[in-house]
Amino acid sequence: MARKSLIQREKKRQKLEMKYHLIRRSSKKEISKVALLSDKWEFYGKLQSPPRNSAPTRLHRRCFLTGRPRANYRDFGLSGHILREMVQACLLPGATRSSW
């Protein structure tokens, strides 16, 4: 189980990313439109002005049961070992263990 402070930090990052999403998108569009290098540098400065935690690359998908940030399956929203346990216990309909 991940510490609750890490999960709260991730939620805070998600809120910041949603808040500054339009600012980042508009400045990226302006950078691609402008031809002069000096004007591009102005927009690069605007792109760097939002907080670092508002960048979408700083977000992690977390397992919604344990909060584990690694080995997540997007389809289920679970980490690998929790997914395996749930499939073994027949808690996920349609999911079967592979055997050969």
Curated annotation (Swiss-Prot):
<keyword id="KW-0687">Ribonucleoprotein</keyword>
<dbReference type="InterPro" id="IPR001209">
    <property type="entry name" value="Ribosomal_uS14"/>
</dbReference>
<keyword id="KW-0699">rRNA-binding</keyword>
<comment type="function">
    <text>Binds 16S rRNA, required for the assembly of 30S particles.</text>
</comment>
<dbReference type="InterPro" id="IPR023036">
    <property type="entry name" value="Ribosomal_uS14_bac/plastid"/>
</dbReference>
<dbReference type="GO" id="GO:0015935">
    <property type="term" value="C:small ribosomal subunit"/>
</dbReference>
<dbReference type="GO" id="GO:0003735">
    <property type="term" value="F:structural constituent of ribosome"/>
</dbReference>
<dbReference type="GO" id="GO:0009507">
    <property type="term" value="C:chloroplast"/>
</dbReference>
<keyword id="KW-0689">Ribosomal protein</keyword>
<comment type="similarity">
    <text>Belongs to the universal ribosomal protein uS14 family.</text>
</comment>
<dbReference type="GO" id="GO:0006412">
    <property type="term" value="P:translation"/>
</dbReference>
<comment type="subunit">
    <text>Part of the 30S ribosomal subunit.</text>
</comment>
<keyword id="KW-0694">RNA-binding</keyword>
<dbReference type="InterPro" id="IPR018271">
    <property type="entry name" value="Ribosomal_uS14_CS"/>
</dbReference>
<keyword id="KW-0150">Chloroplast</keyword>
<dbReference type="Pfam" id="PF00253">
    <property type="entry name" value="Ribosomal_S14"/>
</dbReference>
<protein>
    <recommendedName>
        <fullName>Small ribosomal subunit protein uS14c</fullName>
    </recommendedName>
</protein>
<keyword id="KW-0934">Plastid</keyword>
<dbReference type="GO" id="GO:0019843">
    <property type="term" value="F:rRNA binding"/>
</dbReference>
